[in-house]
Amino acid sequence: MKKISKLTTALALSLSLALSLLGPAHAAPDTSVSNKQNFSTDVIYQIFTDRFSDGNPANNPTGPAFDGTCTNLRLYCGGDWQGIINKINDGYLTGMGVTAIWISQPVENIYSVINYSGVNNTAYHGYWARDFKKTNPAYGTIADFQNLIAAAHAKNIKVIIDFAPNHTSPASLDQPSFAENGKLYNNGRDEGGYTNDTHNLFHHNGGTDFSTTENGIYKNLYDLADLNHNNSTVDTYLKDAIKMWLDLGIDGIRMDAVKHMPFGWQKSFMATVNNYKPVFTFGEWFLGVNEVSAENHKFANVSGMSLLDFRFAQKVRQVFKDNTDNMYGLKSMLEGSATDYAQMEDQVTFIDNHDMERFHNNSANRRKLEQALAFTLTSRGVPAIYYGTEQYMSGGNDPDNRARIPSFSTTTTAYQVSKKLAPLRKSNPAIAYGTTQERWINNDVLIYERKFGNNVAVIAVNRNVNTSASITGLVTSLPAGSYTDVLGGLLNGNNLTVGSGGSASIFTLAAGGTAVWQYTTAVTAPTIGHVGPMMAKPGAAVTIDGRGFGATKGTVYFGTTAVTGANITAWEDTQIKVKIPAVAGGVYNIKIANSAGTSSNVHDNFEVLSGDQVSVRFVVNNATTALGQNVYLAGSVSELGNWDPAKAIGPLYNQVIYQYPTWYYDVTVPAGKTIEFKFLKKQGSTVTWEGGSNHTFTAPTSGTATINVNWQP
């Protein structure tokens, strides 16, 4: 456990010495590797499996698919799961404070070598799946994957898999022999290909131009065979496949291309995960520079998964890499995103990845990367470091941003920044769960405070690498005392003296300087930091993490419904496990009261589902609208808004699968339940319901369905 930085009393020094003599403390439940729902205390390291380490040359592809020199970055280079195991066991990952790895999609990919514009391409990246129930042999066998899970867990590292259920592989409707025709296999059984698709496994609507959300969902991404999630075979297959990987012991899922799959189907997918073996899940929804998307926020708040925080990444790159914005822009991003995302602590922050040019380029000042990394590691959300960032890898867009890692040096400054700061996420709950407050700012300097209970971390960053800054008038929540820079001056930071009322002495923050000061203390009042998953049915398990819960069972509240006794399956000072009570579907606030009756803060936006979920396509014909009007769907279950127009599903689509005046939408609804519903038209605050009796429909118990009705005048 990280020691308290305050150095004012002999008692503190004696306590620190005693703790050091005791050795590593048993991990608190909320920080344990076994906590699959909460990654707020973790640092993720994203590994492009083929580009990391070749631990078993015997599984390398042969022939034109392989380039052992990694000169053609579109071919396999040899990285595999054994290579990752080796780097886990030699301490490279644990040495930089990594507690979770995100690996390439592990499923079997196509074996074809595809020639695009005279250049051979392979599925080295893992995104050209053929069988979601088998492994990619270039990465390893099922046994190798199980060994990876075991090796990671033995070193307190969680394992996240990339998962791309949007599509299979490249295909051409005009050339059935192109590549592998996008074929989908079910544990070796051929389910069908893109051409002669008699089972309707795929969409056949052409390629997306990205002009609308609907266009991006129901048309192909480039030449990738787009799976039809409204097909019961596809739906069941993908849900069974993820169950297989959950059974193998994964701790998290990164969902590829969530903007390009039906939102209702994805919510039913997450309900399946959460009701089976819930794990932390986050999706990829790309946002460009300065792009703020209400659809993106809504998805993160209601889908049951969080997102890669592109808004964070783009702003950090502007401020530290490109110098196209300043610290006020960074502050604005932090404040705006905290309002827009209901679970800010679950959004995954980063500075670069495999779909962006690398943060560092050969001519750049390395300090810019080091500061961006320090900012990410101490900011809200779950930080993810792209492999090789710690080695200052450079490279433009795909595939140059996916080169083989050049070395595994543990002495680079970037590696040391992670080594020193990553452990704070487990030792100081202010970093994992705390609020964020700006304490001092100008164009080049930002000093911000993270706080949880009386635990505090203060971070000062001067992005100007040429000019120091005199810091006067800084007030923090740190108790009076002297604080050492957690980085130990690695980024030219200084120590800090704080007087009464949190007032800091005047100091100079060096050019390009970054300092981190922190204080930890026990939290005595019950304080919730994290709840996961944030969506499940009654009877499912929910994990509540935080501090100050006490050792004796108290009460958990879902709204006004109290849960006590055997329905609380675990109660420790930092973690509670509870079964969702038999309440009606809807959104609830969660809070706890300890055994003495002291109430915690409220954690809001928890969705209780009405039961197991299935994806249903609702279609309404002849729904003509005036300019500015849109069609929505409401009904008798919480998943359809319980007849509340403000919570109605929509606006519905009318361009791709069906065309105006027919409207449609894929929605998750309770399986096997008879549902009443109607469509309505909305324009601003004006609502027009369709006439006649309510439509009635009984949802299937599994698979998918389509319900098609006419608008009732």
Curated annotation (Swiss-Prot):
Q: Where does the sequence pass through the membrane?
A: none
Looking up Gene3D superfamilies in the UniProt record yields:
Glycosidases, Golgi alpha-mannosidase II, Immunoglobulins
CDD domains, alphabetically? AmyAc_AmyMalt_CGTase_like, CBM20_CGTase, IPT_CGTD
Q: Which UniProt keywords apply?
A: Calcium, Disulfide bond, Glycosyltransferase, Metal-binding, Secreted, Signal, Transferase
GO molecular function terms attached to this record? alpha-amylase activity; cyclomaltodextrin glucanotransferase activity; metal ion binding; starch binding
Annotated coiled-coil positions are none
EC code: 2.4.1.19
Annotated region described as E, given as residue ranges: 610-713
Q: Which cysteines are joined by disulfide bonds?
A: C70-C77
Positions of the CBM20 domain: 608-713
Residue ranges of region C? Answer: 434-522
Q: Name one GO cellular component term.
A: extracellular region
- Show the SUPFAM superfamilies listed in the entry: (Trans)glycosidases, E set domains, Glycosyl hydrolase domain, Starch-binding domain-like
Report residues binding substrate.
Y127, W128, H167, N220, L221, Y222, D223, R254, K259, H260, H354, D398, R402
Domain named IPT/TIG is located at 526-607
Uppermost EC category: transferase
Q: Which residues bind Ca(2+) 1?
A: D54, N56, N59, N60, G78, D80
Q: Which residues bind Ca(2+) 2?
A: N166, I217, D226, H260
> What PANTHER family has UniProt attached to this entry?
ALPHA-AMYLASE 1, ALPHA-AMYLASE FAMILY MEMBER
Task: Present the record's domain note.
Answer: May consist of two protein domains: the one in the N-terminal side cleaves the alpha-1,4-glucosidic bond in starch, and the other in the C-terminal side catalyzes other activities, including the reconstitution of an alpha-1,4-glucosidic linkage for cyclizing the maltooligosaccharide produced.
Can you name this protein? Cyclomaltodextrin glucanotransferase
Q: Which organism is this entry from? A: Bacillus sp. (strain 17-1)
Gene from which this protein is expressed: cgt
